[in-house]
Amino acid sequence: MSNNRLVILHGNAHPKLSKEIASCLNTEVGNALVSKFANSETQVIINESVRDVDLYIVQPTCNPSVNDYLMELLVMVDGAKRASAHRITAVVPFFGYARQSKKDKSRAPITCKLVANMMEAAGIDRVITMDLHSSQIQGFFNIPVENVYTEPLFVKYIKKKKKTEFLNQEFVIVSPGVGGVKRAKAISDKLESELAIIHRANKEMSLSLSSSFSFDIEETVLVGDVTGKIAIIIDDIADTCKTLKLASKALIKKGAIKVYALVTHGVFSNNAIDIINDSSITELVITDSIPNEHNKEKCPKLKIISIASVLSETMRRCHHGESVTSISK
């Protein structure tokens, strides 16, 4: 158990979530001013003592200013370290650059590893994050990384829907790609439901029998039965939302009566909200790992569930030296 006082600070990425976490822990957010100089450099002023405290900085590195939010985090950590904070934990619900975690083409950087190096160099002692795009990213760090899963939140939500709306209607959990099968299966196992997988394969087609030109088309293959059932798509990131739209269209075509989607991180780039509004999805559920209240006003299908209780409990256990494994069960 830590004898050091727990203090929460935040940058400009998600003040609302920080305050909700503080409320769950029966404390208040610390006093820090994060702004910019006239030449756009990041300025951080910590207006209270952090000497010997167990400091938690809540800062998702998300849109609309991924790089600014990352820089704010690093500068805050440096300031706190120089002010003799006992331990610094970065609470990064959405970990920016997580999708750049491998060398997928010649001369490509592994930017996620670079970000991990920067965070360690700044002086971060521990990272708390949620549903990393790839769990192997934890290995990029030489410090503890607590990757909290949203499975319990999603399972609880589906069980509530089952009692209030689904009633006796069968439902099936769907992974929109091969890469997300493990995530979807974990939820289907807890709900004792069926699992379906959407596989999108490129198939080469010739323009004509006499032509030497060919092109690739995307072929959607559904593994599993959704006929007459409610399909529930499980994914970690909703970015352009084209995948969700194509998946919902394919599921309806295969006989699903309704399509729901539960996604951890709502990135929503470009016209993603318009794409969701135009899709066959009945309801899209996301967490508040990224601020999305403005998008909720534009999309009646969008529902946001809070992760404040999960993150606050993780922080409490880290502070007291308790196991965090059971939180995701």
From Swiss-Prot:
Gene3D superfamilies: 3.40.50.2020. The keyword Glycoprotein does not apply. Mg(2+) binds at residues 131, 133, 146. Residues 227-242 are annotated as: Binding of phosphoribosylpyrophosphate. GO terms for biological process: 5-phosphoribose 1-diphosphate biosynthetic process; purine nucleotide biosynthetic process. InterPro entries: Pribosyltran_N, PRibTrfase_dom, PRTase-like, Rib-P_diPkinase. Its EC number is 2.7.6.1. It is found in: Cytoplasm. Belongs to the ribose-phosphate pyrophosphokinase family. This is Ribose-phosphate pyrophosphokinase B. It comes from Dictyostelium discoideum (Social amoeba). The gene is prsB.
